[in-house]
Structure formats: structure tokens, C-alpha cells
Amino acid sequence: MEDENFEHNFRLAIQSVPKEDYEKSMCFRFRDDQIATLVSRLFLRQASKRFTGAKWEEIEFNRTQKGKPYLVTPSGYNFGLNTSHQGDLTVFASSCTSEVGVDVMRLDMSRGDKTADEYINSMAKSASANELKNMRCQPTEQMKMTIFYRYWCLKEAVLKATGQGIVDDLSRYDFRIDTNDRYKQGNFLTSTTLLVDNEFQPKWVFEESFVDANHVAATCRTKNLTKSCTLYGDSDANKMFFSKVNFGFLLDDSCILNPLPGNGMDAYNNFLQKPKKN
């Protein structure tokens, strides 16, 4: 997002979200987190505008007690929206029903002084016995960590789809992956299934892919969709990979909701003073 138009787009973006969203984004210490939060809000608003045909300023959101966003105005819609940010990316997913969740992870291979096995052992309480076995049996450090991030994305995605958020025991969520599938960039996988407390959960579809060479993502949605839904039925045409967008897309047909003094110059300078994570 940092191009020659970044300053203009940033100053427009912080004024194109409600005041409370702007203020929340400004609270973050790092630039990365501020941008990610801002982009998440723009994704939700831009998608809702396109799905409903409503004007930018007419759209209103609320959040559940666990923090999951949902559309309030215009009313009468039941589609789901979700965002996630980690590493260098913010991702967005939607579905025809309200139950949809997405998660993204950067494939960080540096773990301080820990080997992959040591790192996995330190996180063992979040994994089932089956998941731990699959992680530990991988032949290389990189493959072990890639599978760890894969499982983590899946767990986050289903918890966001259900709206549960953080749970005490992630090991109850036991994902079964098809070892015959190639988990690599360019592939789109939907074969993964879920057991919760050893009971199969047929309700969910998990869509897994690499956003780019350094980031993996998982989307969770309900399997049974209405016939009016664009994704109704199973076919290769429904394999929707993530596409990268820019500020121009996110701000299309936007308007000012949060006018700032100096057209946002002070806020932009404040942003520049913040450190980057990496």
C-alpha cells in the first residue's frame, strides 16, 4: 500500500471511516497495526456498499459481545463479513450466511532460539494429539512450521465463524487434513474436516490457500447455502482465491464521515512517527 499516492489515500481513508473506528486505529503503537485495522474497516464498508447498493454514509455496523461485526443498516440482509490481519496482509471473506470466518498467518520461520519441535511443544496445549503427530512427522523445519500455521488458521477461522472468539481449550477442535492433498501455493483445498470433542462437524466447509508465497489463509463457512447464493453447489468455478486490492478499490465511491483538521495532515504525521514491526 505504500506507493506514491499513499499519503493522499491514507488521509482520505482515516476520514472515510466513522470517528470511533479512526480513534481505535490511532491507538496502536505500530504503523502495521494501525493500517491493518483501518483496512479492515474499509473492507467491511466497501463490501457492504457493493452487496447492498447502499451509499457509503448510509452503512452502519454493530458488533456481537465477542466482537464479530455485522451489518445493521441497511437492514434485511443476512450475508456474513469477516476480516483478519497478520504479517503483511489484511484479508477479507464473505458468505451468503452470517457464519463465516477467515484467518491469515505469515509463514515466519524465525522462532528465537527454538527449533520447530520446541516451538510446537510450547504450543502443544492448542493442538489435538492427531494434529501434533502431523506437525512433528514433517521432514523439515519449514514444513513443520507451515503445518503449524495451517492448523492455527483453521482454528481461528472456525471460531470467528461461530462468533465464539477465544476459547479455553483449542485442542478440542481437531482438524483432519487429507495428507494426499498438496498444501502449496496455487492450490485450493476444501477436503479438511473438523471434529469437536471427537464429534464430526458436517456443517462447515474449510477453504485453504496461500495468499502469496509468505502467507497462508483459511476461510470457514456453512456448507448449506441458499439456491440464490452465487456459490450454491460444488464446482471448480467456486474456488475463489484471494485477490490483492489497493486503497483505490477500498475507497471507491467513499465519502467523508470523519472530517479532520488540516485534511488529516496531523494524523498522517503522527502515523509516520510510529515504528514498524519489521
Question: Which sequence ranges carry the predicted segments?
Answer:
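Core catalytic alpha/beta fold that binds nucleotide/phospho-ligands
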Residues: 1-278
